Amino acid sequence: MICPRCISYVQATELDLKRYNIQGIIHRLDCIKCNQFVAIKVNDDILNLDNSFNDKYENNWSEMKTNQERIIYYILCQIIYVEFDTPKPEKLETPYDYADKFDIVLIRWENGKPIGFYTVKPKGTEVYSTKEKYTMPVLDTAYIRSAYRNKGFGSEILLDIIKRFPDEDIGFSKPISNTMLKYGSGATSGKGGN
């Protein structure tokens, strides 16, 4: 495979993702010249998020269920967000852990491409540090790829979570980024975050 940015070859690094319930022989493909992430190889198939998955996904939020979707979430959460849209501490943005086993993960699809995700800690899930249980669904993480920001997808997260948990209070994990605080404040005031 060739890097689309600089037309150089890629090198493969094997990843052990079994702890995330991701099956298969997984290799991360990085350009040998520009050292940037290119794609993931799953067994003999290449998974490139810049290619379209038009045959499978509508323009909407979809709950993660399949092995391929777990890999897509891994790429968004552990590679794209961290390496291409580097979290900015001054905006209270932080790197994310991969979602816990009982978390609900939703991926946003637009024109057949995964453009972001959000995760929810379900009501009753144990808080590891205190052994208490969440008393309401909690929005834990949220991310939209930089190329798709300022197009209403952040506000959509709040609308989607409210739709999925009607008649329930919804919490937010902390720290909460400045951007999500803006969306949350706009949603509760009725003005929207955009």
Q: Across the structure, where does each feature detected by a protein language model lie?
A:
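Conserved acetyl-CoA-binding loop-helix of GNAT-fold acetyltransferases
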Residues: 141-163
